[in-house]
Every structure is written in C-alpha cells, then in structure tokens.
Regions:
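Active-site-adjacent helix/loop segment of glycosyltransferases
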Residues: 7, 122, 216-307
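Glycine-rich, basic loop-to-helix element that forms the pyrophosphate-binding segment
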Residues: 61-79
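Conserved donor NDP-sugar-binding/catalytic core segment of glycosyltransferases
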Residues: 96-134
Length: 313
C-alpha cells in the first residue's frame, strides 16, 4: 500500500495546477505517494499539460463540472494510499508537507482519535491566512447570507462588484467563524485547501454539495464521531486565495451555489427550520441586479435546486 494519495481537483486552472503539481513532486520525499488529478471538463489545455509534463499523474477526465466534492470522490474511488491528502489546485508546497502530515499522524499517541489534519496556510507574501474556523451555527449562516443580501442591495446601482472587495466587506459578519490568529491545535473545521485524512469512508464528501460547505459538512461528521480536527505546525503551504476567481462577480455561479449549500448544511446538520434563511436568499435573488444575472444562469433550475436543498437530510 502507498502511504499517501494526493487528490487535486482541476477546473480550468491550468497555470495554478501546473505550479501546484510541480511543488508536490519537487518537495515530497521519503514517502510512497501517488498524485491523482480529477478534472472537471476543463477546456483550457489543462489535460494536455498534465499528460505532457506530469505523466505519472493519475488523471481522471470527468465529462462535465461535477463540483468540488464529487470530483474529489472520483479521486478517492481509485486512491491506493493509506491516507488521503485533498489539495487545492491554487496551493504551492514550500516544504515536505505531505511527509510532515504523515509522520505526525503515524507517531501520535492518540492516532485513533484524529479525524483530519491541516496546516497553517500562508499567502503569497508569507503571512498566515484563513486555515479553518468554528463549525458554523444557524445564526452564523444567517448572518452571512444577510451580509450578501446587504452588499447586493447596496450594489444594485453599481453593476460590478468583485470577490476580493466582497470578502473584505463581509469579514465582520464572518468573524465568529473565521479564526484570524491561527494556532496549532484542535479546531472546528480545516479548510478544504489542504485536508489530510485516513483513506476510509470518513474521507468521502456528500455529493449533494456542488460547491462550498463540503469540507465543513465532512468535518461535522468527524465532530459527531468525536474525531479531532487538528491544525499543526510544520507544513508550509501557500494558498493563493481567489486567484482562480479573479474578475468573478459575486452573484456568479460560485456565490449562488454557496447560498444553496448553506441551505443543505443547515437542513442536514443543524436540523433547523430554514424558512428565514430561504427568504433571505430568495429576496437576494429578486434584487434587480442579482435577478438579471440569475436569469442568464437559469432561474427556474436554481429555484428548484434551492427547494431540493431544503429537503436534504
């Protein structure tokens, strides 16, 4: 058996994926590992690049964009490692991070109590950034969706708003969940950018989520099983946050699926009445600026997805 299976989801992030793969192969030593890339129907030359420059990579060519969790699961289906390391395509390893995770778990005196490991992530300037947070409560989720509605309402006359500014503006609403002063130790959830787990059913994502909340949902299950989610010092990993979202409008595909996923998470894990949350999201979608974009995506389909999400449990 191999020690670790590294699973990377790629969707039209050719340059980022190249740099990520390059760092994995250059930095990973003294461990038996494989790299699996699950591609979600990329059209930017990613597949050709991987075949040419990284022939040892196990490449899964999905016919369409399956979403983050489903694509990772396709990698999990063929993984042969004792451990799984989910790694975002917009990350770069600066040291032998995979071996550090492996050694930490293997040498732990209470390894049977560990559910997942993650590192303290760095930005491109070497500063620590969001690496995890508290498992969100219903109030946290509702607060965040109200923040989105507030921004959209204020933005209806501006026509354009980009991801970076949105995240800055909403940071106060997320403060209860995002942990700024990241330290080694137990945490509610580890970001899905670098998630190290045993290769078993605990590593499988719920495919009801297309985008966002997948890792939070997975780690909520670990929480229910009294398995620890730990951030550890040692691994040095750069996360180029939102580099692959450059220029996205916040009412685009990703934000809408974040809203839908918030309903799934609330209904499934928190067992809460989602009526108020549904109303906030639907009110957001009725704003002229938002509605204009949603109509282009397929409003009827999105409303249907939202209603189905409310029934997931």
């Amino acid at each position: 058996m191999l020690d670790v299976s590294v699973i990377i989801v790629n969707y039209n992030t050719k340059e980022l994926t190249y740099n990520c793969l390059k760092s994995v192969f250059e930095m990973t030593k003294n461990i038996r590992f494989e790299v699996i890339v699950s591609d979600n129907g990329s059209t930017d030359g990613s597949i050709e690049m991987i075949k040419k420059d990284f022939p040892s990579v196990i490449l899964i060519e999905n016919n369409s964009n399956l979403g983050f969790g489903s694509a990772n699961n396709r990698g999990l289906d063929v993984a042969k490692g004792k451990y799984i390391f989910y790694l975002n395509s917009d990350t770069i390893l600066l040291n032998n991070a995979i071996k550090i995770f492996y050694d930490y778990w293997e040498s732990s005196s209470d390894k049977d109590c560990i559910g997942a490991l993650g590192g303290i992530l760095l930005n491109e300037y070497g500063n620590t950034i969001h690496s995890g947070g508290n498992l969100p409560s219903y109030d946290d989720i509702l607060r965040y969706q109200k923040a989105i509605y507030f921004v959209h309402r204020r933005n209806s006359l501006l026509k354009k708003l980009h991801m970076n500014w949105f995240y800055q503006l909403c940071s106060n609403f997320r403060a209860k969940n995002d942990i700024e002063n990241v330290q080694e130790g137990e945490i509610g959830y580890i970001t899905g950018a670098d998630l190290f787990l045993l290769n078993n059913e605990n590593a499988r994502f719920d495919e009801n989520y297309f985008l966002y909340y997948e890792e939070t949902d997975l780690e909520f299950k670990l929480f229910e099983k009294n398995l620890k989610r730990l951030l550890i010092n040692g691994p040095k990993i750069v996360h180029l946050t939102r580099k692959n979202n450059k220029g996205f409008n916040i009412t685009s595909f990703s934000t809408i699926h974040c809203q839908i996923s918030s309903i799934i998470y609330t209904s499934k894990n928190l067992k809460k009445d989602t009526s108020e949350l549904m109303e906030v999201i639907k009110s957001d979608w009725e704003l002229p600026y938002v509605n204009e974009i949603i109509e282009k995506i397929d409003k009827d389909k999105l409303i249907s997805l939202l209603n189905v999400a409310n029934k997931v449990c």
